């Protein structure tokens, strides 16, 4: 989620705002869920399309996002839920919304306010505590996680979640820095990774992949994504839409694979000589992947890697 909207002293641009909201095919009287409120750019646009009977539930695990919603969204059609979208099923059950949802929007990744606030520990460009938690009130911080993880597992995480070529070398240097108590801030980590990287990529900081990998591990981002995709299909009504914006290939691969798998007829026993059971597709792909316009990329460079995929419950 790299979002920015003109509010107060901050600028936050919601990525592919019109495209993602249009993808929901909004019914003015429908029920919608914004799984990643951030600073409310997408939520505001959805509310603008809803009538008096429409409803919008926004979810965010960041306490700062909840405070922002409480201060800036006074609308009887709107409700903010503090928590992870991994619990989407429970949130819908509590409201008797299972099978009644008209649309779900998921804007993945880190929001611009989280990146810009050094204290959150997401940025390798600003000195801050090694935190990286979407919800700083729960779970292990990045520093705690790096202290506990062994070198082999760390190398696997860097390779799998960061697609880092020099994962083993970087993991070794990180663990050495941890043991020597030289890893206290985000800039400490960035410097360790930079020194450990024998080659650098043009236009990309050497620590980019490592920070991504550690953040994904700390927040269990890919596991949570798989869960929310499965739950989305269960809670959407027939004709309900799912709009998902991803920001790196690992996320997009999961979303693409999920839509493809769930839109195919499945033979549960393909090797059986007798056709025993066939599972019909539960969603269909809507259009082709959508990418930010050239103008949007120029206005908000963080949107450049974004991909929007849309599916419909059948």
Curated annotation (Swiss-Prot):
Compartment annotation: Cytoplasm
Coiled-coil portions: none
Swiss-Prot/TrEMBL keywords: Cytoplasm, Methyltransferase, rRNA processing, S-adenosyl-L-methionine, Transferase
Sequence positions that bind S-adenosyl-L-methionine: 40-42, 60, 85, 107, 114
Major location category of this protein: cytoplasm
Gene Ontology CC: cytoplasm
GO MF annotations in UniProt: rRNA (cytosine-N4-)-methyltransferase activity
GO terms of biological process kind: rRNA base methylation
Enzyme Commission code: 2.1.1.199
Classification via InterPro entries: RsmH, SAM-dep_MeTrfase_MraW_recog, SAM-dependent_MTases_sf
Enzyme class: transferase
One Pfam family this sequence matches: Methyltransf_5
The reaction(s) this protein catalyses: cytidine(1402) in 16S rRNA + S-adenosyl-L-methionine = N(4)-methylcytidine(1402) in 16S rRNA + S-adenosyl-L-homocysteine + H(+)
NCBIfam families the record matches: 16S rRNA (cytosine(1402)-N(4))-methyltransferase RsmH
UniProt function note: Specifically methylates the N4 position of cytidine in position 1402 (C1402) of 16S rRNA.
Family: Belongs to the methyltransferase superfamily. RsmH family.
Protein known as: Ribosomal RNA small subunit methyltransferase H
Gene label: rsmH
């Amino acid at each position: 989620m790299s979002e920015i909207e003109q509010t107060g002293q901050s600028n936050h641009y919601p990525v592919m705002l019109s495209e993602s909201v249009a993808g929901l095919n909004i019914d003015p009287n429908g029920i919608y869920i914004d799984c990643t409120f951030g600073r409310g750019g997408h939520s505001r646009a959805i509310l603008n399309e809803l009538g008096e009977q429409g409803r919008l539930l926004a979810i965010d695990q960041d306490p700062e996002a909840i405070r922002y919603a409480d201060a800036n969204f006074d609308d009887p059609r709107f409700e903010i839920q503090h928590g992870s979208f991994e619990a989407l099923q429970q949130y819908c059950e509590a409201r008797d919304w299972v099978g009644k949802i008209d649309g779900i929007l998921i804007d993945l990744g880190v929001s611009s306010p989280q990146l810009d606030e050094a204290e959150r520990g997401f940025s390798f460009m600003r000195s801050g505590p090694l935190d990286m938690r979407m919800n700083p009130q729960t779970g292990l911080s990045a520093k705690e996680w790096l202290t506990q993880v062994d070198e082999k597992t760390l190398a696997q995480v860097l390779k799998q979640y960061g697609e880092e070529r020099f994962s083993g070398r970087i993991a070794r240097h990180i663990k050495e820095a941890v043991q020597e108590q030289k890893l206290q801030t985000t800039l400490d980590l960035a410097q360790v990774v930079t020194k450990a990287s024998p080659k650098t990529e043009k236009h990309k900081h050497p620590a980019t992949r490592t920070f991504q990998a550690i953040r994904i591990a700390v927040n269990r981002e890919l596991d949570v994504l798989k869960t929310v995709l499965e739950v989305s299909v269960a809670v959407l009504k027939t004709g309900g839409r799912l709009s998902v914006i991803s920001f790196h290939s690992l996320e997009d691969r999961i979303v693409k694979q999920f839509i493809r798998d769930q839109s195919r007829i499945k033979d549960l026993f393909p090797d059986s000589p007798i056709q025993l059971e066939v599972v019909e597709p539960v969603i269909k792909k809507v259009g082709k992947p959508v990418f930010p316009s050239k103008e949007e990329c120029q206005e908000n460079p963080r949107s450049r890697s974004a991909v929007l995929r849309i599916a419909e419950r059948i």
